[in-house]
Structure formats: C-alpha cells, structure tokens
C-alpha cells in the first residue's frame, strides 16, 4: 500500500494484493473499490470478497493517512511531497507456522522506516528519525497485540480463503493435451 501527499487535501492511495507472488487485487483511493487483477480474475472469490476487501482497504487507507500525518508532524515536515509505503502480510511456512510482517517506508528512503516483529511484538526503528514515531505508537498507536492478531489470525484466515479458491481453480483446469506427430525421414530425403 502506498499513500502520497503532494499538497494539502491532495493525496493518492494505491494498494496491490499479491497471492503467491502474483497480483490478484488492486485498490485505489480515487475509485475506492477493490478490483480483481491477474490471478484474482481467474479465482472464484465472489462479490462478497471484493466488498470485504474494499471495506478493509478503505480502513487501511484511513489508517495510513493518519500515520502519514503523525510522521510528518513528528518529523517537523509540512507541505510538499511525502509518501508512506506499507508492506504487510503473512506467509504460511512449510511447517504450517505463520510469519507475519509489517514494514513502513517513508519518503522513498532506501530502507524501511519502521518494522514490526510479530514474534517479539515491538516496532523496530530502522532509521534514527523513526524513534519518535516508535515511542508515540508504543503509547498511542496500534497496539502490538492487535497488530500481531491481525498478522497471524486475520491475515491467515484471508490466506486460507484465497488458497481454497486457488486450489479450486487448479482442480477445475483441464489436463494439458499434447499432440505429437512422427514421420520417417529416409536418408538423403527431406
């Protein structure tokens, strides 16, 4: 998800969803609608899935706008071009354990601004300028236990729903057909 602010009241929000490294949804703040893309078009997710994704991403957009405002205030930054990028999700490991992640990038820095470790729960400062935000969020921001629940429970439930649909997609495909033609070539003839 990315939010950019180029002047007061004018911002852009874009979220892309990936499943198994393939894009399956796109949401932008202008249309305020989650739409299937790529793999999502092939998956039979149903209208209620896209309505739920739209509702969830509208809330994520609101949260990112609030986070960007807080970060800009803590950094003493006003008008101008600013961006906040959030990468969050969960991965189902081979042993069926879940790895959740949430990384924030601010103003196109080459490194993360803040990261969340779902094992130990704290926000980790990736740059010294993020320390003020970390302290603010530890007292007033997203509670670590709720973030962990989102990454390990809510996200995993969504992952299982998509996985079930994806498996159905694979099961409903016809097996590939191959035609082989063989002819004898006599030596010296083509």
Describe the predicted segments one by one.
Residues 1-190:
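Extracellular/lumenal regions of secretory-pathway proteins
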């Amino acid at each position: 998800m990315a939010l950019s602010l180029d002047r007061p009241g004018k911002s852009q929000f874009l979220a892309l969803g990936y499943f198994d490294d393939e894009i399956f949804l796109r949401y932008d703040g202008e249309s305020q609608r989650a739409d299937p893309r790529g793999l999502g078009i092939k998956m039979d997710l149903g209208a209620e899935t896209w309505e739920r994704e739209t509702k969830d991403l509208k809330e994520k957009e609101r949260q990112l706008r609030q986070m960007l405002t807080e970060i800009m205030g803590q950094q003493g930054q006003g008008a101008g071009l600013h961006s906040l990028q959030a990468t969050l999700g969960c991965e189902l490991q081979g042993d069926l354990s879940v790895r959740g992640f949430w990384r924030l990038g601010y103003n196109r820095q080459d490194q993360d601004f803040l990261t969340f470790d779902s094992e130990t729960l704290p926000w980790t400062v990736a740059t010294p300028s993020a320390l003020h935000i970390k302290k603010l969020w530890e007292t007033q921001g997203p509670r670590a236990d709720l973030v962990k629940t989102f990454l390990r429970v809510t996200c995993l439930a969504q992952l299982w729903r998509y996985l079930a649909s994806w498996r159905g997609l694979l099961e409903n495909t016809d097996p590939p057909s191959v035609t082989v033609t063989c002819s004898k070539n006599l030596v010296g003839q083509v």
